[in-house]
Amino acid sequence: MKRVITRTALTLALAVVSTASLNTQAQSQAPNAGTEPVLAKELAPARSYGKLTVTSAAFQSGGTLEDKYTQNGDNVSPPISWSRGPAGTMSYVVLTEDSGVNRPDPISHWVIYYSPSNVTALPENTPTEAKLENGAMQGLNVRKAAGFVGPKPPAGQMHPYHFEVFALNKRLNIDPATADRATVIAAMKGHVLALGDISANYTGK
C-alpha cells in the first residue's frame, strides 16, 4: 500500500512540474507580452543633454488634445513652438508619436526633418505636403503619407501623444518618399545637440 501511495505521489509531482514548465514557456513566447514602445528621444538622445522647451497654444503639457486635431474632428495638426537650439544647430526634426500601444514601436503621426535652424514653430493646420514653404521636409506617417495624421485610438482608450523636437548639427538629406520614423531616427543618431517634448492625451470615441 505504501509503495502505491509513493508512486502516485511521484506521478502527481511530475505532472505539476511539467504543467508549470509548459505555462512558463507559453508565457515567454507570447507575442509582445508587456511590451512598451520606445520613444524617439530614447533612441536618439542629445549628445550634451541639451534641453529645448516645447510648447503649444492648443494644449498644456499633459493636457487633453481637442477633437479638431484628431480623426474624429478636422484632422489638422496643432501649433507647436520650441526654443532655439544651441550653437551649432543646423536643422530641427519634429516627431509625433503615440506611446499608448502594446508594441515595440510607437505609432508615428508626424515626421518633419530638414527644418531650417531659424524656424522654431509650426502653425496649426500645417499643409500635408512633402516640402513646406519654410524649407522643412515632411516624411511618412503611419499611413505612409506625408504630413500630420491625427489620433484615433480605440473607443474608451486614452493614449498619450508626444510631440518631440530635436536640434541637430547637420541637415538630413533623405528622400521624402522613404523618410519614415525609423529612417529619420537612424539618420539623426549621434547628431542631436538638444531635444525637448510636450505631450497631450486623447481618448478614443
Which ranges hold each PLM region?
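Bacterial N-terminal signal peptides that target proteins for export
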Residues: 1-10
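Bacterial N-terminal signal peptides
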Residues: 9-20
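N-terminus-centered regions that define maturation/targeting leaders and the start
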Residues: 22-205
